[in-house]
Regions:
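Terminal domain-initiation and capping elements
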Residues: 1-67
């Protein structure tokens, strides 16, 4: 069964209920951002895709993906 993408951040704001939905927490998300040198305020959209990988766009419209 394929999973649907789940939005985790929008315009620098964490969507806490969606983190709970995917069995993650804010500490996990902050660690992911720190490891990749990202700041919450620079994230336009960040989501967990159907393959359980993080995909995001920054305010500069840079698309990146990582596990």
């Amino acid at each position: 069964k394929e999973k649907i993408p789940v939005l985790l951040m929008l315009q620098g704001n964490v969507i806490k209920e969606n983190l709970v939905f995917v069995n993650r927490n804010e500490e996990w998300l902050k660690h992911i951002l720190k490891v990749h040198g990202l700041e919450e305020k620079n994230i336009e959209i960040l989501y967990l895709d159907s393959q359980d990988q993080i995909q995001f766009y920054t305010k500069n419209n840079l698309k990146r993906d990582f596990v």
